[in-house]
Amino acid sequence: IDVAFLNEVVYGAKNFLEGKLGRKLPDVDLPAWLSYLALDAGLREQENEVEVLLVHTPAADVLKCCEPSDVNKLNHQACRTPLGEFAFSSVTSSGLVSTEELFLDLMNLALDSADVKCLMLLPFHQVYGNGVEEKLAGFFKDKNEEERGKAVYFITEEPLSPVYCRLEPVFYSLAHAFGIKSDEL
């Protein structure tokens, strides 16, 4: 998860939805939202081990509109949900590489790992989505459907070219995490 993307999307969606619904929305319960994303990705109740990598710059260490919100305090923490255990790791670019390069490197490592059964991606689409989409397309183009199901790319808008993996909209799980019912939308 790119923290800058999460902050922009969650903050923007919260402000938009509060205006549309005419009421104040709670901050997002981060473990609950991650559970909704995992369900969208196909995980079901069992003993899943979900590693959540929070990729950020040193200055962006707070999750806006989320609880818990301190990225550094989340580092090396875990929580259990009916889907399994979510273990958090804070990964910072520390100025050595860009967040984009770090995200793409971590994504490539996970794609190549036999230990990773499902890779859920939330990059900063507006900043480096094209790079993510090019890498995904190159990796999955010649793979079969089962192999293509390894990655779930959470999107705010449709990619301009095929990425050859599963696409899921991020908005519905976020609306659910805000406590919004489908008939309110």
Regions found by a protein language model. Give the residues of each.
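Surface-exposed flexible segments
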Residues: 11-12, 66-69, 133-140
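Eukaryote-biased recognition of electropositive, low-complexity segments
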Residues: 89-93, 135-185
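Internal, well-ordered interaction modules that form the hydrophobic cores of assembly/scaffold domains
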Residues: 57, 98, 107-160
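A charged nuclease-like catalytic/ligand-binding cleft shared by nucleic-acid processing domains
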Residues: 3-8, 15, 19-120, 128, ...
